[in-house]
Amino acid sequence: MSALNKLFGDERKRDLESNVAALFSQSSGPVDTLEVKSKPRTLLPVVSKRQETETAKPAEPTEIVEADLPRKRAKKAKKTNEDDDHLEEKYMQQVLKEDSDHESEAEAPTEPVVELKPSKRASRPDMKEEELAKAERTVFVGNVPHEAITDKKVYKEFKQLVAQRKLSKEDEDDEEQKAEKYAVESIRFRSIAFEEALPRKVAFVQQKLHHTRDSVNAYVVYAEKEAVTAACKLNGSVFHDHHLRFDSVAHPAPHDRKRSVFVGNLDFEESEESLWKHFMSCGPIEYVRIVRDPKTNVGKGFAYVQFADLVSVNKALLLNDKKMAVGKGRKLRVTRCRNMQKVQRQSNTAALPKLTDQQKTKLGRARKVLGKADRATLGKLTIEGTRATKGANTPNLRVKKARSKTGRVTKRSQAFKKAEANKKQK
């Protein structure tokens, strides 16, 4: 073969050359750039990573997949059947849970957040509510004999008189049964006249009473409000030759000018008992009131007498310009009472804080019922928790001034005490 190849050449080489020649003979010539640009661009399909991984995994045998499918379907069907069995129970539990959540939200509403500020002391106007409640249980007793403040025996008798027994239907039927009496909290005596211008406590301890004034006034405070009505029925009763006048402090009896007479030209030292006896012949008397000076408790020379009916007034007018059979024996001037308009005091409401309608009502009532000391602090602001301070006394009251520490009297007393101490040492 090698010899033949050398003579005639290699066949493979000849075939290759012929093929190459045939390839270039079929060429279409040079490339046209315009034709290339006009051809559409070929786009390759995008392959995702998931497809790449799936293609990269070896294909599982179809027999195994076909064998696992019935098992999975059976498990899924069994699971759905179990879910269907417990579906109603789960639904009811969900409904109950939602109802309980709604109830808890309704019971405990969300409260708005409040910013806490530093606390301050509470302040409110002093309406004297305790004193007003005490006035509802207080009775005024006039023309009380002055022995009630000097003699303990007379005082006990007076206390037994005002402490009445409680009347009821059972007590009226059974007289042997002893009924309970109204409890008396306190008895205060006022309108006491003294002979010398001393402090009231000193003059009372020394018993320097005015010799011409034989009566005083008293305020009886009961433990129950019902006792006031029963005590007012004792009006006009006689106690140690004195006609007592009982009246409520909170709800006093109104002054009826048509049943009253004005008595003038009285002696300054005249007593209520002498007027009571003088007008007793005219008819039943409700009360006798002599107007007195608040500082000295001595009469101003005129009085008012109120009767129980209108007929007694005409009889009393016949005693005009006639001398009194008892007492000082002066001629009296008896006339009808005039309809005098009361001068209303201007209340200084500008200095008071802003009050409600209810507080204004209490303020006006307290001014008529309470005394001078309580009226001075009425309506003023009181700060809870504060204590009384020295010098914060009630205005318009008599206050004894403290003795000077550097005055002449103090120096003389100190020198006298030193001299007495030196004498004792010697």
From Swiss-Prot:
Residues 137-251, 259-339 form the RRM domain. It is found in: Nucleus, Nucleolus. One of its GO terms (molecular function) is RNA binding. SUPFAM superfamilies: RNA-binding domain, RBD. InterPro entries: Nucleotide-bd_a/b_plait_sf, RBD_domain_sf, RRM2_Nop12p-like, RRM_dom. GO terms for biological process: maturation of LSU-rRNA from tricistronic rRNA transcript (SSU-rRNA, 5.8S rRNA, LSU-rRNA). Keywords: Nucleus, Repeat, Ribosome biogenesis, RNA-binding, rRNA processing. It comes from the Eukaryota. The keyword Lipoprotein does not apply. Residues 87-105, 417-426 have a biased composition (Basic and acidic residues). Residues 26-128, 401-426 are annotated as: Disordered. Residues 401-415 have a biased composition (Basic residues). Involved in pre-25S rRNA processing. Belongs to the RRM RBM34 family. PANTHER family: EUKARYOTIC TRANSLATION INITIATION FACTOR 4B/4H, RNA-BINDING PROTEIN 34. This is Nucleolar protein 12.
